[in-house]
Structures are given as C-alpha cells and as structure tokens.
Amino acid sequence: MLILASASQSRKKLLENSQIEFIQISSNFDEALVKEKDISNLTLELSFQKASRIALNIQEIDLPEKFNYSSVEILGCDSIFEFNGRPFGKPSDKDEAYRRWSQMSGEFGFLHTGHTLLFSTFDSSSKILKVTKKIKKTVSSKVYFSKLQDEEIKNYVDSLEPLYCAGGFALEGKGGKYIERIDGCFSNVMGLSLPWLRKSLIKEGIFP
C-alpha cells in the first residue's frame, strides 16, 4: 500500500487519475528545519524528511481500520520553482506574486520536484514499520511562460491561485493557459513525476 506523505491536492489528484491505490497522510514537517542552498538538493532532502517523518511516527498515526498490509511504500515529495538561479516558493502575498509574474512573463524557469520512496515491511497488529530500502531522485522540468499583458497578470494574481503554488502558478488550474510549453516530465510540474514513480515501483516488483 502506498502512503502519500503530503497534503497536496495536486499530487492526490494525479494518483487518483492514474488509479493508483493509496492513502494520503500529511507529514506536517517544518521545512524551515532544512538548510540547503542547492535547490535540487533542497527538494530532495525535504522529500526525504517528509517520508521519514511518516515512517518514524507510524504508530501515532490514525490509520484506516482495515490497514492490514504487510508491505508499505511511503512517498515524499517537495517542489520548488527556480527562476534565474533563485528559488521561488509560494508567494507570501499578492504583491510578491505580481512582481514574480512580471519577471517570469515571456521567460522560462525550472520546476524541481524531489521524490523519496521508502519501501518497508509492516506489522498491522503492532504497527511496527521497518524501512528496507529507499529510492531518491530530483526530477526537473523546464517551463516556458507566455508573454503576458499587465492586465492578465493582475487578473491571475487577483484569483489568489498563485499564492498556493510553488513558483506562483498552477499548470492544472487557471495558470495553465499562461504556460507556452514544457520540456521534460509534464506531471512533475504538478508536483509528482508519475513516470518516475511507476518505474521505481516496478523495479521492486510492484505494478501500480
């Protein structure tokens, strides 16, 4: 059984649409605890910490009543948008979102998503979980933005969508129409590389 160690609705929808069986549990990990300047390495470490937190605290988590699986896979993810070498997380307010979009208009950046997959054995009666293997990788996608009119930027920022997304845009939402093209994994831009997940599971004999 796959556990998605994230509260992200985008990642949840990706797994649901792919008909991959899973349960979603937020790790509630404090991202400020990780100090790493390299953006790619930062996303990878954050994904690992999120997955590890679920593994370490599994006995305290209120699991579904019929969670009687002998093997459990825990998936942690974290996404950060890189623009001109700088990390763009979620904008703190509308003013910051407007400034960022004014810079990104007609330009490109990179969406990095760190992935960690912990494979483990699980005793449902004692709720003892033992991690047997981990796979980690950062997947990066190049995102090209359309040249926007100032009014378009204002309207998008006023929708408030940018305030809830890494980089200040949502490919699957209103922001999708402002993205010219993507080089690399499409689903990665939404927070989870489905091809990477599929290949990682299949390597361990799990066919999602």
Swiss-Prot record:
Enzyme class: hydrolase
GO cellular component, one term: cytoplasm
Residue pairs linked by disulfide bridges in the UniProt entry: none
UniProt keyword terms in alphabetical order: Cytoplasm, Hydrolase, Nucleotide metabolism
Residues annotated as the enzyme's active site: 78 (proton acceptor)
CDD domains: Maf (cd00555)
GO molecular function: nucleoside triphosphate diphosphatase activity
Locations listed in the record: Cytoplasm
Names of the cofactor(s): a divalent metal cation
Catalytic activity: a ribonucleoside 5'-triphosphate + H2O = a ribonucleoside 5'-phosphate + diphosphate + H(+); a 2'-deoxyribonucleoside 5'-triphosphate + H2O = a 2'-deoxyribonucleoside 5'-phosphate + diphosphate + H(+)
Enzyme Commission code: 3.6.1.9
Predominant location: cytoplasm
Function of the protein: Nucleoside triphosphate pyrophosphatase. May have a dual role in cell division arrest and in preventing the incorporation of modified nucleotides into cellular nucleic acids.
Alphabetized HAMAP family for the sequence: Maf (MF_00528)
Record family assignment: Belongs to the Maf family.
Protein name from the UniProt record: Nucleoside triphosphate pyrophosphatase
Organism in which the protein naturally occurs: Prochlorococcus marinus subsp. pastoris (strain CCMP1986 / NIES-2087 / MED4)
